[in-house]
Structures are given as C-alpha cells and as structure tokens.
C-alpha cells in the first residue's frame, strides 16, 4: 500500500475533525482550514490509490 494513501486518509480524518470543531465553535477560519485539509487528504489518498493501481498493473504484465 502506497504511503500517500495512508497519509492522505489521515489528513482527511484530521481535516474532518478540524472542520467539525470550527463549525461547532463558530470559528469559520478553523472550519475552512479543516475543509481544505480534508480535500488535500482526499487528493493525496487518490494519488496513492492510483500509484497502487499502476504498481499492480505492472506486476500483472510481467
């Protein structure tokens, strides 16, 4: 499993928590930071999934 997949998933969770805290406390800045971090994590996780798919495809063609 690609490390970007794991790190991205962790960023998604952290961002979701931060976003929720911002929403509950009424801190729009924290909410937006959390949403941004969540989306960055989603992109990083997808990049890791793609790397895994490419790795698996190259293994199966050998």
From Swiss-Prot:
It comes from the Bacteria. Residues 32-62 are annotated as: Disordered. Gene3D superfamilies: YjbJ (1.10.1470.10). Belongs to the UPF0337 (CsbD) family. This is UPF0337 protein XCC0070. It comes from Xanthomonas campestris pv. campestris (strain ATCC 33913 / DSM 3586 / NCPPB 528 / LMG 568 / P 25).
């Amino acid at each position: 499993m690609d490390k970007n997949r794991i790190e991205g998933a962790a960023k998604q969770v952290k961002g979701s928590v931060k976003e929720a805290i911002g929403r509950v406390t009424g801190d729009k800045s924290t909410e937006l930071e959390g949403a941004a971090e969540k989306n960055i994590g989603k992109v990083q996780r997808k990049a890791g999934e793609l790397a895994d798919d490419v790795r698996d495809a190259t293994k199966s063609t050998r």
